[in-house]
Regions:
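ATP-dependent helicase/translocase motor core
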Residues: 1-180
Length: 180
């Protein structure tokens, strides 16, 4: 296994533990409440290692490096911050440029909120949960901090019914009838 792959496995686990569903870009679904898209496409044919979405809107990027690469490098930070300004047109964003930047090599994790121009990267023990990001950014969305519904243990019809119910409420409907 390559060093990059080892770091990705650790980072995937960190994201999952925080409540993010990690998927490759071919399996992105805007219906998932908290999703980290691997190799997220950006403007100019660039790819963010992870593009973070809350309720179908991009909120930040996570730049992953192999364990031997220092994430304290200005080059790594500049690369990730460029990605925050490259949100493609097909993708909605909570803010543009994206406000949150994470850097990780699987061992260490740095974070910066780019809304504060002179802010510095700070070291974190874990990635923010979707609920913590909702509070941090002051997002006004009742569903943005909800955990992602997991398919495991549900029949396809149950998963589909619950997902459609959530989408109905997200769309502003205040009532729904669900029959299983």
């Amino acid at each position: 296994m390559k060093p990059e792959e080892k770091a990705r496995i650790i980072i995937d686990r960190m994201l999952n533990d925080a409540g993010w569903e990690v998927v490759d870009r071919n399996h992105y679904s805007p219906e998932v409440s908290a999703i980290a898209v691997e190799e997220g496409l950006l403007k100019g044919n660039r790819e963010a290692d992870y593009l973070l979405f809350l309720n179908g809107k991009a909120v930040g990027v996570l730049e992953a490096k192999k364990e031997s690469v220092s994430i304290y490098s200005e080059i790594v930070a500049d690369q990730a911050e460029k990605y925050t300004r490259g949100v493609p047109h097909w993708c909605q964003a909570w803010m543009n440029p994206l406000p949150l930047v994470y850097l990780s090599n699987g061992r260490e994790l740095l974070f910066r909120d780019t809304r504060e121009v002179d802010s510095e990267y700070i070291s974190l023990n874990k990635i923010h949960s979707p609920k913590e990001i909702v509070k941090l950014l002051g997002l006004k969305d009742d569903f943005a901090g909800l955990p992602t519904l997991k398919r495991k243990g549900l029949r396809d019809c149950q998963y589909e019914a619950i997902t459609k119910l959530e989408n109905s409420f997200r769309s502003g409907h205040d009532r729904a009838l669900m029959v299983l």
